[in-house]
Amino acid sequence: MEATLDGTELRVLGSLVEKDLTTPEYYPLSLNALVNACNQKSNRDPVLSLDESQVTRALDTLRFKQYALVSGSGGRVAKYRHALVEKFRFSPAELAILCELMLRGPQTVGELRGRGERMHKFSDLSEVESVLADLAERTPSLVAKLPLQPGRKEPRYCQLFSGEPDLSELAAQMEARGAGADGEKIARLEQELSELREEVASLRETIAEFRKSFE
């Protein structure tokens, strides 16, 4: 890409696209609404905590790179919107796929179809694959297919607005997420085991008292 985006710029741009497609009645966005969109916990990976100054700096860069526009002057509240349709002539399906990749990182075809449904209704997986192929064939390419990870059946795709992917970093992130999920599962099982032990102890006490009543 001629204008590579950093993580904050990518989150801001993805949030603008998402709100354009999901809540057009509230779009373009004020700065406050955009900050909230960037920091929301649903449909985000990772969840961020950006402040207004960070979002403003990202907006300035996106405007300079012609990825975003601002409207409102003369005392009116400034509103921000993305300029991807004007710049790249994206279809709604392409916008939905790119938005998901910007907001959640690399994903499989199935994940993109399921998660992208809120922005564009895909007829089937082949439509998603077709959109990904079109984006990959652009000059320069806008998405890339990642090598299949060990133990996984489906490859994932990533966006290239933030540059070529660092495969070693992506692998480390996936391992960390897997370890975190395993840790949460172990903690949950330990909690359930502790609760079961308490229930068994309580039941034994009840049985002992019941037997005493017949002695």
Curated annotation (Swiss-Prot):
Q: List the disulfide bonds.
A: none
SUPFAM superfamilies membership: Winged helix' DNA-binding domain
Q: Which Pfam families match?
A: DUF480
Top-level taxon in the UniProt lineage = Bacteria
The record ties this protein, via InterPro entries, to:
DUF480, WH-like_DNA-bd_sf, WH_DNA-bd_sf
The family classification in the record reads: Belongs to the UPF0502 family.
HAMAP family linked: UPF0502
Q: What is this protein called?
A: UPF0502 protein Gbem_0102
